Amino acid sequence: MEMTGWRTYRRPDDKSGGHGVGWSPIIPYSFKVPDGWDEVPVSIADLGGTEIDLRFANPKEGRLFVIVAPVRRFADDLDDATIEKIGNPEKVITAFGPEVIGENVEGKVLSTATAERSGRTYYQFELEPPHVFITATAAGNRLYLFSVTANGLQWKRHYKDLKQIAESFRVV
């Protein structure tokens, strides 16, 4: 499905990432963004304990980031993790939502959906406040959290696009 004025970002295979010993290369991921969204450098200072792999933003529409975290922090050592092995949607959002929004997610989850694409399961959440879509999946020995967020005005104006960005996330 090609959308006019949209482009696909795919994580380069040779992009560095991962920390410490025993890290395998990150399985690449991709997503679609409208024109005008650009990569924003990730500074070590803004990590705040989370493993942010990538940031994108559009000053008028919103911003997104990708967290790639080792599964072993949350589950027994899995080399071929699936999101289902980590837990059901409720367990996943309760455990990882705070990594994304910086606070407890209780009472903030508006909707939860499960989607299967190319044999991989994705959990999709909509939270507010803050306004955020989170898409979660697992691959290899990592958990992927894709977060698309915006302020109130951006959310109102660009809700459809923001949701489309969130739903376009794939681990390749």
Q: How does the language model describe each region?
A:
Residues 1-133, 138-172:
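N-terminal targeting sequences that direct proteins away from the cytosol to non-cytosolic compartments
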